[in-house]
């Protein structure tokens, strides 16, 4: 059984027991989160596709941890001007474990 849901402007295909990183959620570690923007639920041959959302569809997850991703370096370089600008960025994320899929 798997489902496709929307969170943080992105769509994720998940199944029970899977862990994934989402955009940062303002929820405490160990808390339960419910995602109700479910776009598709499939259980073997039984597939429910929403238009745009599946009615009564819900993905339940448990927050494992919060953290920051790998550093991305941003460099702006002007040729022949002896000028450059360097910056780094680390995006916050929330890691969740999928505990249930309801349709």
From Swiss-Prot:
It comes from the Bacteria. Pfam families: Ribosomal_L21p. Keywords: Ribonucleoprotein, Ribosomal protein, RNA-binding, rRNA-binding. One of its GO terms (molecular function) is structural constituent of ribosome. One of its GO terms (cellular component) is ribosome. The keyword Ribonucleoprotein applies. One of its GO terms (biological process) is translation. Signal peptide: none annotated. The keyword Ribonucleoprotein applies. Part of the 50S ribosomal subunit. Contacts protein L20. This protein binds to 23S rRNA in the presence of protein L20. Belongs to the bacterial ribosomal protein bL21 family. This is Large ribosomal subunit protein bL21.
């Amino acid at each position: 059984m798997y489902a496709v849901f929307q969170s943080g402007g992105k769509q994720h295909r998940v199944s029970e027991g899977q862990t994934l990183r989402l955009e940062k959620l303002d929820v405490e570690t160990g808390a339960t989160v419910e995602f109700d923007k479910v776009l598709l639920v499939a259980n073997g041959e039984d597939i429910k596709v929403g238009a745009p959302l599946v009615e009564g569809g819900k993905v339940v997850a448990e927050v494992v941890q919060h953290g920051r991703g790998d550093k991305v370096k941003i460099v702006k370089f002007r040729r022949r001007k002896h000028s450059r600008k360097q910056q780094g960025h680390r995006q916050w994320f929330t890691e969740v474990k999928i505990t249930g899929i309801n349709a």
